[in-house]
Amino acid sequence: LTDAYSLLKMLYRNPKYDKNESVIHVLTNRAASFGEGKMVFDKLESVVKQFLDGSVHYIGIIPQDAMLEKAVRIQKPVSIVSPNARSSKRFEELAQYLVSGGKQDSSEQNAFRQFLTKLFNLS
């Protein structure tokens, strides 16, 4: 959390940075749950508003799992070490979110898309 704040502080102090022209996306890495990840983000968001007069946009978490720990230990991407790990799947979802320009499926659309993918064995 302190590293993220320090980086944002340096960014906001850079005369070339215009906070009105940029959106800063934040994700919580290695969170035990979505609730924990959101709580960490809320603390960062509060400090950024209070001390930097800025804002950040929450895009979620990368969940902590055994395969992520293993991937970090052997210095390989978790998506290669274990493509089916929770963390790998979340990286994929976040990549799709960013590629789509920040448009997320509603949970109903996402569930239906997953159903069709499994039904027709698409991937």
Descriptions of predicted regions:
Residues V47, F51, D65, G101:
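Phosphate/oxyanion-binding loops and surfaces in catalytic or ligand/nucleic-acid-binding neighborhoods
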Residues S6, M67, R86:
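Residue-level recognition of oxygen-bearing side chains
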Residues L27-N29, I74-V81:
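Short hinge/gating elements
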Residues Y17, M39-D42, K70-K76, Q104-N110:
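A general structural signal for short secondary-structure boundary/capping elements
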Residues L1-G60:
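Conserved catalytic-core segment of NTP-binding enzymes
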